[in-house]
Amino acid sequence: MAFPACARPRSLALALASAFMSAGAALAQPAGLQVLQGAASVSASGKNLTITTSNGAGLNHSALNWQSFSVPAGSVTRFEQPSAASTSINRVTGADPSAILGTLTSNGKLVLVNPAGIAVGPGGVVDTAGF
């Protein structure tokens, strides 16, 4: 018996959420940073990761590539940008989807691009000037 068309997206969303929840313990903080524009540094302390960015010359944004970008449950990933008007553009180049199961914060705007997909889980929090 086929699912009605309106149930298919819900079924897909539930399947993705289940996959992320079961993989939650294996998820790691963002990794494999490559700076394309501006500057960025990463510091870790326990389950907290801080990414400090500065804008490209004459620009109001930084551009970063990541091999992987997920935020595990119980962890915090914080972007510190020059101002609330700054934007950090983050592109995932690896094959895995991004799962936001912990807390992702920024004093500025964040753009997260992942062709494999992005999911914010039930315990996931995104607190930014714009996402």
Briefly describe each language-model feature range.
Residues A2-L12, L16-F131:
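Solvent-exposed adhesion/ligand-recognition segments of exported proteins
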